[in-house]
Amino acid sequence: MRSHTGLRALVAPGCSLLLLYLLAATRPDRAVGDPADSAFTSLPVREEMMAKYANLSLETYNISLTEQTRVSEQNITLERPSHLELECTFTATEDVMSMNVTWKKDDALLETTDGFNTTKMGDTLYSQYRFTVFNSKQMGKYSCFLGEELRGTFNIRVPKVHGKNKPLITYVGDSTVLKCECQNCLPLNWTWYMSNGTAQVPIDVHVNDKFDINGSYANETKLKVKHLLEEDGGSYWCRAAFPLGESEEHIKLVVLSFMVPLKPFLAIIAEVILLVAIILLCEVYTQKKKNDPDDGKEFEQIEQLKSDDSNGIENNVPRYRKTDSGDQ
């Protein structure tokens, strides 16, 4: 009540109607949208983009070409939106004033805009291309062509994810941990995938308690696979998401059964048994060969005795002298 009384005291009776008109004119109509009102409450798209990318850092990269080095490449890693300035420099003994300069993104020719700047000073040519990388569409391969034989290429990509290069070998019933990391970078998030034979399937730890996903630091991720079965072996992928794109790494998991580690021992046992059998056969053959000469000697002795006996009988038979037929 006191507040209304005070208001009436401040407003003169003759000004009451004027005040009501002013209030009605300045009151926003919520039923009907006012374009001017929306323009007042939100920035235009261009101003919003300018404000969003005003604080981006400028990164400069240079490739130097010579008559000896006519083709050169450079890899650029970008984690977040940035302003880029790519520069190709060519120094030659010949005149470079008549040399034509073009830029391409992948295989598409880039149109000449304010971002291009080519300067020729004596025997040196400088060509710059400045632009803003704010999404994955600006990533790729940028090349400067100086004439027909000189080329400098900038490969712009997101940070690379590193995992285990060799297959990870484990056994049925065990648990294992697959790890991926990104050096000197901070991904927005990590996602794990496994192969179902034909495609990559996201791993959801909330649905399948066989998996656990964690990491001690933001630039790494770990996938724990529990109670391994042979069918759990196969291909796994870790994927890191960045503001400018994604990067993934492939990890091979091999799950062996209990018989697999026993196979080498069984093979050794089989080899030992075979070796022992060969040794025994050799011993039997050698022993038999030793016995065979004795039997031969006995046979020879018997034959010799028979021969001697026959000779003795022949010697005991009386011999008769032959006489001439005339004497008879």
Swiss-Prot record:
Interacts with SLC16A1, SLC16A6 and SLC16A7. GO terms for biological process: axon guidance; cell adhesion; dendrite self-avoidance; homophilic cell adhesion via plasma membrane adhesion molecules; plasma membrane lactate transport. This is Embigin. It is found in: Cell membrane; Synapse. Pfam families: I-set (PF07679). Induction: Regulated by muscle activity. Strongly up-regulated after muscle denervation, including that of soleus muscle. Expression is significantly increased 3 days after denervation and reaches a maximum, about 130-fold increase, after 5 days. Residues 67-160, 159-254 form the Ig-like domain. Residues 289-328 are annotated as: Disordered. The keyword Cell membrane applies.
